[in-house]
Amino acid sequence: NLKGGESVSNGDTLTFNGTSNPTVAGNITYAGNIVSGAQTGSTVTFTGNIQAESFKVAHYYGRVHMADNELEVNKLWVGAGGGYDNSLYGALDLDSGNVTTAGQVRLAELGHGVLNVNQGSSLTVTGSNDTHSTSASFLLAHWAYSGELNLRGGSLTALQTSMHLSWDGTGIFNAASGTADLQGMDFWASGSGSFRGSFLLGGATSGDARVNIGSSGVTNVAGAAVIKLGEGTLGALSNWGISYNPNFTASYIELLGTVNGTILDTLDANDHATGRTVTFSNGLKGDGKLVKVGDGVLVLNGTAQAPVPAEGETAAVPGFTGTVELREGGLTVKDSSGIGQGSLLIGGG
């Protein structure tokens, strides 16, 4: 076990740099910063509990794993350290048995950052800084690199702040399996009128993640912001919505799921009794299915994508041809443009 003394300040740094496949099994209590990286083809695995001011995964080509342990830090940064190099990345896997708690999670510091929340692990973001700044408690792409958060069977909780998809870089939240409880998501990037990032729920034929959204909702879905809803479930922790600043061009919500579709459950995910209202201000596109279940109401206030015929060398743009199905609760559609060329099913038919 390693325990930093009183002389250690939060500006001091302890570095682990693996060149083979080392396992760090002892517990670490350190008042300063811990930096870990793995060279190409190698892996550093931590199985002991860690308490520190920060844990930063440096941007090399190897991987850092946390397994059967607890990681408790004020700052968790992935893709950090060294000089600027757009070809490098840092990768952190939270594996089975890991419980991670961080006041701030920030990806893509000085290189690409990848954070995987795998089966049997949990990540909780406890910070409450929800400002539009680099100090935000949950930021997927700080500098001009990509930050990728993959939910792969684990659990993700951030109820005091929204997930900020981008700043100078472009963030991706890819929910394939597992459960996320989020206060919200925000696509506003660093510049005025700049919106970037991607939220991907499952795929066209696979995926079973459940992402529950709170009262902050999913905001600033405009410009280069991307939402693709495939196989999986969107749930409600409160009334929430998907929205954009009307001074800018809205992005569409693309429906991908063609097997069970995207399940939208408006029954409160906590008390399992309160019907919630979920409002989509953005229009729909794609050929997938959106299936409304549970007490509560889905409101479609957006305009579905209309088809655009080919002209000259410009390819045709298909309109929305998917399906919106109401199985339980209520559905409000502003007018026929909310469904466009798509299909509306009531009670399955």
Where are the model-predicted features located?
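Catalytic-histidine neighborhood of serine endopeptidases
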Residues: 348-349
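N-terminal extracellular ligand-recognition/capping segment immediately after the signal peptide
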Residues: 20-21, 234, 241-250
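Short, solvent-exposed aromatic-acidic interface loops
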Residues: 217-221
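Extracellular repeat-rich scaffold modules on cell surfaces
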Residues: 1-20, 24, 28-77, 81-88, ...
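Structured, non-catalytic alpha/beta "coupling" segments that mediate domain-domain communication
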Residues: 224-227, 231-240
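Parallel beta-helix/beta-solenoid repeats that form elongated, surface-exposed shafts/blades used
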Residues: 26, 243-254, 282
